[in-house]
Amino acid sequence: MQPIWTMRPAETGLAGAARRVLRTKLPPAALLAAAAVTVAAVVAATGWRAAGPAPSAAQLDEWQAMVAQAVEPHALAQLRTLARRGSGDAQAALGIALVDAREPGLRDEGRGWLETAAQADGRTDTPAARRAQLALGKALLLGSGDMPKDYARARTLLGEAAAQGDPAAAYYLGLIYRSGYGVAADPVRAAHWFEIASRADIPAADFMLANAYREGSGVPRDEARALALYRRAAEHELPEAVQTLAMAYRNGELGLRPDADEFHAQWIETAHALKHPVVAP
């Protein structure tokens, strides 16, 4: 037993093994061999820890938000490491976080990761690929930083995502065909894609589909259906829908009777909705 003044906690694990090897009185050759085995074990264990279990979707979302809001160094490093190892989810998260960054270099990096994730080695039906296609398609449709608009490429990317069931991509396809961005305007196709997005409870799609039914654009004119869709979008505090209802009550539109009280109530709600706008899909 060691004297009390020299006693130390028991050394365990690879670090303890390394120290014990160095304290052992062995011939030089044997000592070198033992040290080499120990170092190899340490390297192997370290590599295993670095790979580790894949982070959860919630963790990736948290890192994405941290990078998007403040380019937080630790979150950025984590996503870059995973993206370089081939994680499609990390590539999509990093691309989405950086595509609207202030620094041009970071924006370029973001677009690069979105391009990589959107391809997904040909497996474009993966969730990561759909997220990347949606984000890149939106950026090319609406414009992002110094990225030039490319309506044709946007339509292709959004079409691929929508074909795999992404309702937000369907909404943006509706906008493309409604306004004729890079293609002839097609009210029927626009209404079709708005209908798909509306089924997923996207308020902006409800509003655009309501407009189509109100105007008879691409679908039969149906004010009752339009009113129901406006009301559903207004329940989500979409400012445009609330304002439309207010004007309908004021002017007696959409089959409603003029109602000053409802008009004022909806007008107040419009002001509230403008302060807390619905996040775009």
Predicted features along the sequence, with ranges:
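N-terminal leader/linker segments that initiate helical-solenoid repeat arrays
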Residues: V39-I96
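Hydrophobic face of amphipathic alpha-helices that form TPR/SEL1-like repeat modules
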Residues: A93-D100, Q133-L142, Y172-S179, D206-E215, ...
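Alpha-helical tetratricopeptide repeat
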Residues: P55-Q64, L76, R80, A92, ...
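Short helix-capping/linker turns of helical repeat alpha-solenoids
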Residues: V71, R85-G88, D100-R102, A120-R123, ...
